[in-house]
Design a protein with these regions (language model features):
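Hydrophobic core segments of alpha-helical transmembrane domains in multi-pass membrane transport
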Residues: 16-32, 104-107, 152-166, 190-203, ...
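Membrane-interface loop-to-helix entry segments
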Residues: 21-28, 32-45, 173-179, 185-194, ...
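Helix-loop-helix module between adjacent transmembrane segments
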Residues: 29-30, 103-129, 136, 140-173, ...
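Flexible loop linkers connecting adjacent transmembrane helices
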Residues: 36-63, 87-89, 93-97, 109-146, ...
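Extracellular/periplasmic helix-exit of transmembrane alpha-helices
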Residues: 114-126, 228-245, 256-259, 291-293, ...
Length: 454
């Protein structure tokens, strides 16, 4: 009964209106910045990938831009990139991946706007070099009235709740399921180990979360992509057929599992919703991590937001989908594991279980940071709120190991929609600031403009 109710509410909030709003908002920012990901691609690459090989002193303090984007990627590159892609293929057919791509391309500029505003309106902790920011700050400061404050509070409440579903239960449930299937580890042991590890990260605060993600994200990404590369190399002759399925299935009424006249919209809805679950463009949560960056230019940190969506969806999710479709394994949440096992035997299944565990744990680390920032914003003077949140978060991590994944995924989709709507409203209101900052940056020839933390 509970699962049916959550699924019904999720479908209502992820209706045609929400899908259209998400796509139109992304198109608005893409067109308003002159199709920046395409027309300014050399600058974006130079200021992101190219900057990794340059050493610079940051005037604003904080963590490095790469460390910030690693933390954000830790939150976005969770089980949705592996388990979620298989589920999307089962629910929406191969065409759902095409709509995931469309949503990701437009979502790049939505994420860019979020990150730019988060860095522009970030604040410095009193008596410390640490920086904090995110939607609750750019909403309340950028819209300095009762409506803005109410919207900021609403975002924080939904983000804190989402940290229990998307950020803890979904991720730890996937870890427990993967380790039980591949290594026969009981869920109780997984729950105990994850609770201890997450408690260790929580105890270390923002610095420990950022350091852990900076080390974990590049390692887990390469590890997983190598495994997918082996699968694709084995079925390389089937890759063109897989791409054809994705493109043709996007416009076929009977492409989705639902079939019939509603199949087209089901494919689109599943692709957009699952895509947002992975890249989080429009949700605003990842901008909390970007706001910790000591980047002197909000625009340049916004470029890292574009990079984040590309890596998460265009790269990792696409590789997952191609590996599943090319290997022709049964579609579903465990499709990627079936593909790995088909090619590499039991060792492949174990390899994917490790990859799922790494992706999911990185997501847990990032979301515990997001949730804490929201609680600190809601209860700035409370000594009990943060310890209580941490206790509840750890409880959620343990409970996720025993939860039913379909129910948790539906709850995650529901809370994502609750996050999306107030954040998109704020982004549209604050869009003139995004366009002005972008024009000013490129009018100066793409040079850095210092943005002091408040």
């Amino acid at each position: 009964m509970l699962g049916q109710t959550v699924e019904l509410l999720s479908q209502l909030l992820w209706g045609r209106g929400t899908i259209a709003l998400t796509l139109l908002c992304g198109l608005y920012f893409t067109a308003g910045t002159g199709f920046l990901p395409l027309t300014r691609l050399p600058t974006v690459l130079k200021r992101t990938v190219g900057s990794l090989f340059q050493k610079r002193d940051r005037k604003s303090g904080g963590v490095s831009p790469f460390a910030a984007v690693s933390t954000a990627l830790g939150g976005t590159m969770g089980v949705g990139n592996i388990v979620g892609v298989g589920a999307a293929l089962a629910l929406g057919g191969a065409g759902s991946i095409f709509w995931m791509w469309i949503g990701a391309f437009l979502g790049m500029m939505t994420k860019y706007a979020e990150v730019l505003l988060a860095v522009r309106w970030r604040q410095r902790d009193k008596g410390a070099k640490a920086l904090r920011g995110g939607p609750m700050y750019y909403i309340s400061c950028g819209i300095p009235n009762a409506f803005g404050k109410a919207l900021a509070v609403l975002f924080c409440v939904f983000c804190a709740l989402a940290s229990f579903s998307s950020g803890s239960m979904t991720q730890t449930g996937a870890i427990a399921e993967a380790l039980q299937e591949s290594f026969s580890l009981p869920p109780l042991l997984c729950a105990a180990a994850l609770t201890l590890l997450c408690g260790w990260v929580l105890h270390g605060g923002c610095d420990r979360a950022v350091r852990t993600c900076s080390a974990l994200v590049p390692l887990m990404s390469v590890f997983y992509l190598v495994g997918c590369g082996v699968v694709l190399l084995t079925f390389r002759q089937s890759i063109p057929d897989a791409l054809t399925q994705i493109v043709s299935g996007a416009f076929s009424p009977a492409s989705a599992a639902a079939g019939g006249a509603s199949g087209f919209f089901v494919s689109m809805r599943v692709g957009i919703a699952r895509g947002i679950f992975t890249h989080e463009a429009g949700l605003g949560s990842a901008s909390i991590a970007h706001a910790c960056s000591g980047a002197d230019s909000p625009v340049e940190q916004g470029f890292w937001g574009i990079f984040e969506v590309f890596c998460d969806t265009i790269l990792v999710c696409s590789v997952t989908a191609l590996a599943i479709l090319a290997s022709e394994v049964p579609l579903g949440p465990s499709a990627a594991q079936a593909a790995f096992t088909l090619v590499m035997g039991p060792a492949g299944g174990r390899m994917l279980a490790v990859a799922v565990s790494l992706f999911a744990f990185a997501s847990v680390i990032s979301f515990c940071l997001y949730g804490q920032r929201c609680i600190e914003y809601l209860f700035p003077n409370s000594r009990l709120a943060l310890p209580l949140y941490r206790l509840l978060f750890l409880t959620g991590c343990a409970a996720g190991c025993f939860a039913q994944l379909p129910l948790v995924f539906s709850l995650a989709d529901l809370l994502n929609a609750c996050l999306l709507l107030p954040n998109l409203a704020a982004l549209l209101i604050l869009s003139p600031q995004v366009f002005e900052a972008t024009r000013e940056y490129f009018a100066k020839g793409g040079t850095r403009s210092c943005s002091s933390a408040r």
